[in-house]
Amino acid sequence: MQINSHLSVLIHDLAKKHGGRTALEYKDYGGTQWKHVSWNEFSNQVTRVSEALLALGVGVQEKIAVFSQNSIHYLFTDFGAWGVRACTIPLYATTSEETMQYIINEAKIRYIFCGEQEQYDKARHVQNLCSSLLKIIIYDRSVTIAEHDPSSIYFDDFLKMGFSITGSGEVEKRQQSATWEDLACILYTSGTTG
């Protein structure tokens, strides 16, 4: 099988080809043991993210932000977003609050995914300055969510939101309507790259 897939279905096509073979190896936040993820597991997690994004009402080509260091969750989020034809905007893990505010406002971001405590704290502060930002989704369960913060949830709770979409065919409809013109990712730079 030749793999020449649109990003919206790439991981699923690779899972059909490679199934139970290892796709990724990673360490959890603060972990010391390597963990393995098969192509089938990777595909399953990507589908769950896609379903949860649809449950939130993420539209075609809507921009979502990821503010985290590299992690397995980051990959699930990217491919899950592309699975519903959303566009991801990565924010470097040490991005300043001023830069975050500019990007969130300029791109009209409603949802931001955060890695660790520092990223969550910045996102929470910036949320008060950005009227479009509705929800903060946190990868690391050890992050302490601020008291009286109903707009932030942990990634595993976010995934549960998608259960209402499971089996509805909505993700597949988005994937079938994907085009090569879809934006996948927008990278903001400091302007010093030339």
For each feature predicted by the language model, list its residue ranges:
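Conserved adenylation A10 loop of the ANL superfamily
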Residues: G30-G31, I186-G194
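Hydrophobic/aromatic ligand-binding patch that stacks against planar heteroaromatic rings
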Residues: G80, V126, Y188
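Structural core segment of the AMP-binding/adenylate-forming
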Residues: G83-M161
